[in-house]
Amino acid sequence: MTTFYLSLIISLFFLIITLKVFFNTSRKFKNLPPGPQCLPIIGNLHQLKQPLHHTFHTLSQKYGQIFSLWFGSRLVVVVSSLTIAQECFTKNDIVLANRPHFLTGKYIGYNNTTVAQSPYGDHWRNLRRILSIEILSSHRLNSFLEIRRDEIMRLIQKLAQKSYNGFTEVELRPMFSEMTFNTIMRMVSGKRYYGNDCDVSDVEEARLFRGIIKEVVSLGGANNVGDFLGFLRWFDFDGLEKRLKKISKRTDAFLQGLIDEHRFGKRNSNTMIDHLLTQQQSQPEYYTDQIIKGLMVVMLLAGTDTSSVTIEWAMSNLLNHPEIMKKAKNELDTHIGHDRQVDEHDISKLPYLQSIVYETLRLHAAAPLLVPHLSSEDFSLGGYNIPQNTILMVNAWVIHRDPNLWSDPTCFKPERFEKEGEVNKLLSFGLGRRACPGENLSQRTEGLTLGLLIQCFEWKRIGEEKIDMVEAKGITAGKKTSLNAMCKVRHPLKINDVF
Ligand code: HEM
């Protein structure tokens, strides 16, 4: 009899717990944004075709400007409206200031402790402060100006040598990647890693490093199914975790080597490592080697590809629209003339050139879904309930093509930015406290590179055919095919440095 009552009490206890969980859960998931039917266990993962922002665009046409998906057991909400995106990063900015954790963050991002992956809180705030003051402040960016100028001039010289005797076909992508990569690498460590004229004494070291970065970029992204289906991780069926473990060891050893070189060898130069090692001397408990390596990784991964793909898209659009290229050239000829090269401080006086950069960022945002955010508590958005631990993605690609916001939204028309306030509708660098801290640096690099490319050369397409504008599948939305074009040095331009 006692056993009977005991079993009854235990059963009732479990029934109450189950009902409580059920009611809490269903209340929690009541009034969610609409979304497609999902399958047991995998949710909507089977529907996620690359590029993801295109799939989300199709889904938003059916389910609206805010919809829900299930990535395995994780709820994902996708926003495709500027007003709702602004609601995310004003009223709900703190609730959405966390990041979801992915396998790449665990292995490459020092267990999600870097500034790009770290949860919102004191640690993240400190890292943002270090990044803003020690590396990306206007003062520091000015002190790194010579590096940027030198790398861009190397690119200009290379093109000038190739095309001095007339129109010559050039492949631009590797040159843009070399330039942005060397710029960031020199800011970080003082070393040039790319190109025939790289100054790394150990060529093997340069080769190894290029391999590391290529692999890290290919493993990044928020669409590894193993991130959402925990049980797949136990089997590591695609070997992703094993590859990430291996690559993280190589990356760490490489970055540690760079720090040690500065610690035990050449100090007192203007590099990020040296500035951080100086801070380490006074505050060793905070400025650990791991913090420094995390900042190096973020600078290299967030700051290189993003800028080079933007420059490649801008040039592709200019080649498809010679009248825009001509207008930009006239602006440069009028304001700068033929006797000197355009410089970074001129860019603010060249509104049309700036508008070309904005228009490129509108149509070809390098991070079309920004970077995923995570809600730290339940909140409401666009009239729906969003539970804690929801992954939020903003489809900037769609918002930048919204016909209610932009006239002829798919046309490349820099003139649209002549209207005051238009630039405030851009989401290319995100909004709110987790917005991109590298915006100023990237706009300086893009403005100067494009300015010099337009000022110093004549450009045309290889044939009649327009440049193919199809997007690749990688984490940064680059062009699928590498950009080749015909270029010729502009003879009226008497610039000794270039020739
Ligand atoms: C065209 C160039 C670039 C574009 C389009 C771009 C875009 C973005 C976007 C959309 C985000 C996420 C914002 C969000 O979470 O809502 C981001 C974050 C970030 N970007 Fe950039 N970025 C560019 C260049 C750079 C550069 C040059 C650097 C640094 C050298 C940089 C460093 C970062 C960092 C550290 C974060 C993470 C911020 C955080 O989580 O607190 N980015 N970027």
From Swiss-Prot:
PROSITE patterns: CYTOCHROME_P450
Residues that, per the record, bind heme: C436
Localization in the cell: Membrane
Keyword set, alphabetical order: Heme, Iron, Membrane, Metal-binding, Monooxygenase, NADP, Oxidoreductase, Transmembrane, Transmembrane helix
One cellular-component annotation, GO: membrane
Top EC category: oxidoreductase
Keyword ATP-binding: no
Disulfide cross-links: none
Cofactor: heme
UniProt-listed Enzyme Commission number(s): 1.14.13.-
Principal localisation: membrane
Record flagged with keyword Lipid biosynthesis: no
Residues annotated as transmembrane: 3-23
Membrane topology (UniProt): Single-pass membrane protein
Molecular function per GO: heme binding; iron ion binding; monooxygenase activity; oxidoreductase activity, acting on paired donors, with incorporation or reduction of molecular oxygen
Function: Probable monooxygenases exhibiting no activity with isoflavones such as formononetin, biochanin A, pseudobaptigenin, daidzein, genistein, isoformononetin and prunetin, or with flavonoids including naringenin, liquiritigenin, apigenin, luteolin, or kaempferol.
Family statement: Belongs to the cytochrome P450 family.
Protein name: Cytochrome P450 81E8
Taxonomic path: Eukaryota, Viridiplantae, Streptophyta, Embryophyta, Tracheophyta
